[in-house]
């Protein structure tokens, strides 16, 4: 399923198609990812181009699990303002109660870095 997901977020789609169809397909892919697929996504996402990272962040807005929050926090470590804004917007409704105490601490540290 990860390969199909990557085809969509890396695809050369119009904005209309992305926001009308592909975004929802990608959200559905993510909601059915195994732990292994999430781990692979985390290891691969830094190599995605900015547009693909923005699309990933957009998809994660409605995927509430510990992996989605972790990915969004990692992606906030960017110089690209569009990606940063998308991550912050997606984090707005994140369920931080899904994280362990240590993961919450790491989120706090990373959030402080973003604000500096």
Identify the residue ranges that each predicted region occupies.
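Structural detector for internal amphipathic alpha-helices that build alpha-solenoid repeat scaffolds
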Residues: 10-32, 54-64, 74, 85-102
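Short coil turns that connect the paired helices of HEAT/ARM alpha-solenoid repeats
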Residues: 15, 45-51, 76-82, 113-116
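Alpha-helix boundary/capping and short turn/kink residues
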Residues: 35, 50, 62-65, 81
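Short, contiguous, helix-prone interaction/anchoring segments in small proteins
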Residues: 38-53, 59
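Amphipathic alpha-helical scaffolding segments comprising HEAT/armadillo-like alpha-solenoid repeats
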Residues: 2-8, 31-44, 65-77, 97-115
